[in-house]
Amino acid sequence: MAIPKHFDRSILISHLHDQFWSQEYYLAANKLKDWKATKGTGWAKDLFRKIDEVDSDVTQEKREVLETNASRRLIKSYFRKTQQFCSRGFLERGDLSEHLAMPQRLSMLFEIIEVFEYAREPDYNREMFDFYDDLHRVQLFRPGR
């Protein structure tokens, strides 16, 4: 797909910025941080084990599992979408490092989302995580590196 000659990236950056700073993102991030903080070692694998146990009888614990997984998927989708816009030429790497993927935001990606990916499948696709790692390599702690 050809990018229009006068494509204005600022509209796309503004939209993505609004997503990353939304109440929805904030609530999802807090849900994931709470899960990690309260589930002890094995917190990432525990989510997927409990997802497999969910049936039609939805208890408070099962609801928490489903909400936590929805939060994981939402945040991962924001990062994936932003990375794809960059890799397809709609955004430049500088747009991400300056506006959308500051080091403090990437800690959620590396310290929680990537750990979930590894727990689900040790041979997970690292492309998106490597992409963001390259933006701020020196400044970030990445357990999966």
What do these predicted regions represent?
Residues 1-49:
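Membrane-proximal alpha-helical anchors
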